[in-house]
Amino acid sequence: MSESAPMELIWYGRTCVRLRGKEAVVVADPYQSVVGPTGRGITGDIVTFSHPDDAPVARGKPKGKLSRDGTTLIPSSLDAAFVLDGPGEYEVKEVLVTGVRTYRDDAKGSEHGKGVSFVLEVDGIHTIHLGEIGHLLSEEKLGDIGAVDIACVPIGGTLSPTKAAALMAQLDPKIVVPMTLCDDDGDCAEALAKFLHEMGAEPVTQPKLSVTASSLPGETMTVLLESRGKQA
């Protein structure tokens, strides 16, 4: 990629997103059967799991690679990727990654378990992948996260649309990317509509987000992405 090429962010459904920068490709929360629009497996240099305790586990499939937690299988197309699934600070292929402990509920994980939100610095752009977070952030957590440009936020999970909007007010990103989680399309549409109303947003759906550090908007905008993933 040339130096002027934008970072690309593609959503593959649920909490799976792929960030392509100049030096590396990051795939967050890949599920075992994820493939791209062409039917080929998605590839990447770095894989992050925001909820390793409950990530999809393939059973009866010969191909796959265990992540560091020892239970989660990642797609074979990501065999060579560097896997991150816990809190901490990392640098891989010029990508700075900060994993911050979060929870999938508002009860310190006692109901739905722990999670990890990852801040990914790619091409000078700070993107936070919130995974399946279920709560607002404390001042301490906000300090650990720092300033973010793009926020990928779950909609339709344990985090209500109102709390999701409040979380975005806490983080104050330039771009908000909703990730719908519901199993029922109707529930997803309702939750997304409520979130967009809370945000005061009327976004247009697009296949991917392409952005550079210099092209980030001055005020927060919400971008709806088409799900590019499909079951293998």
Regions found by a protein language model. Give the residues of each.
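Divalent metal-coordination and catalytic microenvironments
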Residues: 19, 47, 97, 132, ...
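Zn-dependent metallo-beta-lactamase
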Residues: 1-22, 80, 86-89, 94, ...
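Conserved beta-strand hairpin/beta-sheet module of binuclear metal-dependent hydrolase folds
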Residues: 2-35, 111-131, 150
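Portal/gating segments that form or line small-molecule/metal binding sites
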Residues: 61-127
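Active-site metal-binding loops of divalent metal-dependent hydrolases
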Residues: 30-32, 51-53, 102-104, 131-135, ...
